[in-house]
């Protein structure tokens, strides 16, 4: 801690890099590791999380099942309803967790208004920016304090490498908040280090690195870091082509007689069209969902008869992929939770 540097691969190595304009970033073994570390760094036993109901099924299940066993509870909210979001915040709430583009509703939260609510209550706004990626939006310019990525998706882009990234904007004032003594008070694990006093703006990410990453070890391997850094260089070009392909398919589906609905914020009739123009003027990405007329059987028939698309869940691959969220990415959710997430059998 006296001198920064690469002392051990599990903690840091020279083939990991910071992105997105934050003050510091931490690479992890997977996107779910990035989510888990972020939550565990902010919330401890007896604490509370407010989370969007329209998040990835794995994150939803983490918050609903294992974390309550460790004393961390969550209230899931409709992030379109700002009054509901604020009403859910308690004295022991430690973060508001959203996704820039929701998985699988592809909804866009009002980042600036949510940031205003979170900051009013002295807690950070955390956004999983996996589906949007920094090329399409800099979430920090809209009030987000911490960004999370599954680097497996658009950053990796080839379905061969698992990784995650946590990026700290460095803008949240942990000391002024009064709710995060773990970053302010002297701790015994690092010889009476106070993160806010001794490392300043990078207090959060350093705490994650020297506590959670060091002590639990879910580090990104140097080789995977090398692959992700290589592919990051072409991410803008790949995303542009992804978007072109997506728009062509969306146009086809919108006009298909057997399609009930298409969720894609760029569509003029999307409830998120105005937010897309505000927050994602460059483009809204290439992930979309659609509902066929009928039920799960009809949805399965569509998937089974596709020739170009592979039935795989690792979004943003170089291959064209399709998935049935209700039985895969969100398969562990109850019917009530699926409904809240906007995931239907069809």
Q: In which residue ranges do the predicted regions lie?
A:
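Short clusters of hydrophobic/aromatic residues that line enzyme substrate/ligand-binding pockets
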Residues: 8, 155, 322
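Conserved C-terminal alpha-helix-loop-beta "cap" of PLP-dependent enzymes
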Residues: 258-346
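A glycine-/small-polar-enriched, mobile loop at the entrance of the PLP active site in fold-type I
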Residues: 1-21, 26
